[in-house]
A protein has these predicted regions:
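A short, surface-exposed alpha-helical micro-motif characterized by mixed small hydrophobic
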Residues: 203-205
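ABC ATPase "signature
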Residues: 221-222
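The feature captures the beta-strand-to-loop junction immediately N-terminal to the Walker
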Residues: 36-38
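Conserved ABC transporter NBD signature motif
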Residues: 58-68, 74
Length: 246
């Protein structure tokens, strides 16, 4: 598989003095990579740099192009799902308009594609009923809102989805359901994923590789089998122990 995203020598110093130090990793086509670390370790800062919300030094190659220099070249092909779906869904829009906003703006559909059929297919992909299309975000449960956020993201046909702590506010059953949804999307669509999480247990099943970050530096990486069977760093062992995995 080819690399869809390559991060090389990424560095950034914040006003607080916190630093991202020499970040290097790749994500291949169709691969799920999880970035794991405690709160304040730099996970979300990296995701914001990738999507152009923060500037940094180094290289981020997306399909071979340095998007730190040419952020507009992303053109919707990298999408981000946020921790709080409610805050990212326009409360004045019905669910149908929320899902289709990016589709229409970015002219995602081919001429032969019917927008109503496309919308129903997206709903089916994320496990939502068409009855919710005329509802507003405040009328939905937390799990439904998160599925709407996923639907809106998948609808624009991205190559890479960054999911930032999206399970944190959900109950255990809904977490399992959302992970199963991503597993299905992973199998059926050619999308790469970067999961951001403080809980190594939550993303264990769906991940192909894990990146462990501490104090702005990636200290360990490898397949999930390697990380769980032979963790090299004490910090990694601590994360595994905290999650209750044996």
């Amino acid at each position: 598989m080819k690399e869809i995203l390559s991060i090389r020598n990424l560095n950034k110093t914040f006003e607080s003095g916190f630093k991202l130090k020499n970040i290097n990793f790749d994500i291949k086509e169709g691969e799920v990579v999880s970035l794991i670390g405690e709160s304040g370790s730099g996970k979300t800062s990296i995701s914001k740099i990738i999507v152009g919300l923060l500037k940094a030094e180094g290289q981020i190659l997306f399909k071979g192009m340095n998007i730190l220099k040419y952020p507009k070249k992303i053109n919707g092909k990298i999408q981000m799902i946020f921790q709080s779906p409610y805050s990212s869904l326009n409360p004045k829009y019905k669910i149908k308009d929320i899902i289709l906003e990016g589709v229409i703006y970015q002219k995602v559909l081919e001429k032969e594609e019917n927008i109503d059929e496309y919308l129903l297919n997206i709903l089916n992909d994320v496990g939502l009923d068409k009855e919710i299309l005329n509802k507003y975000p405040h009328e939905l449960s937390g799990g439904q809102r998160q599925r709407v956020g996923i639907a809106r993201t998948v609808a624009v046909k991205p190559d890479l989805i960054i999911a930032d702590e999206i399970l944190t506010a959900l109950d255990a059953l809904t977490q399992i359901q959302i992970l199963e949804l991503f597993q299905k999307l992973k199998e059926n669509k050619k999308i790469s994923y970067l999961f951001i999480s403080h809980d190594i247990n939550v993303v264990k099943k769906i991940s192909d590789r894990l990146l462990i970050i501490k104090d702005g530096e990636i200290i360990e990486s490898g397949t999930k089998e390697k990380i769980f069977s032979k963790p090299e760093k004490e910090y990694t062992k601590k994360l595994i122990e905290i999650s209750g995995i044996r």
